[in-house]
Amino acid sequence: MSDQLTPRQMFCAPVLSALLFGGGSAGISDIYVHIRDIVPLSARDWESNPLERRLARWHTSLARAINDFVRLGVVKEDGHAKWGLTEKGFAVAKEFELVSGDGVLIDRALLRKKLDEFALEFEKMYKIVTRPSAHTPSTGE
């Protein structure tokens, strides 16, 4: 896997976790630290981005994941290079058991262990958002 980019869905649960850890919002540097601690980044992820040389490729994948969350209404911009959870975002975090009903955050070790499972679920969300016309209902019934 070291020759492939980490799919952006792998960043989704850690982004929500970073925002929860920050009390509902976090700056990009805090999110970066959280991602590096949780996501097993490949050698390719650390390569320089061809379009933005000062950034690693994983920064672009992370930015796309955050933008997807903004489009979904899960995350909102909360200032310059800062994001916050919306009510919907908090509900998604609860649904994925990133936070308990009592407000206890998921343990980072458990998050690392369940990362693939979370990524698969977030992939389902993306298919709905990025391909809304993929399923055309039959009208001839």
Where are these regions (language model features)?
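Short helix-capping/hinge SLiMs at alpha-helix to coil transitions
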Residues: 19-24, 37-41, 78-79
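An amphipathic alpha-helix signature
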Residues: 28-32, 36
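A short, conserved structural fragment
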Residues: 70-80
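Positively charged, polyanion-binding regions of nucleic-acid-associated proteins
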Residues: 2-29
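Short, positively charged loop/turn segments that connect secondary-structure elements
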Residues: 4-6, 36-63
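Minor-groove-contacting beta-hairpin "wing" of winged helix-turn-helix DNA-binding domains
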Residues: 81-87
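Solvent-exposed, charged helical/coil patches
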Residues: 133-141
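Short, amphipathic alpha-helical interaction segments positioned at domain boundaries
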Residues: 88-132
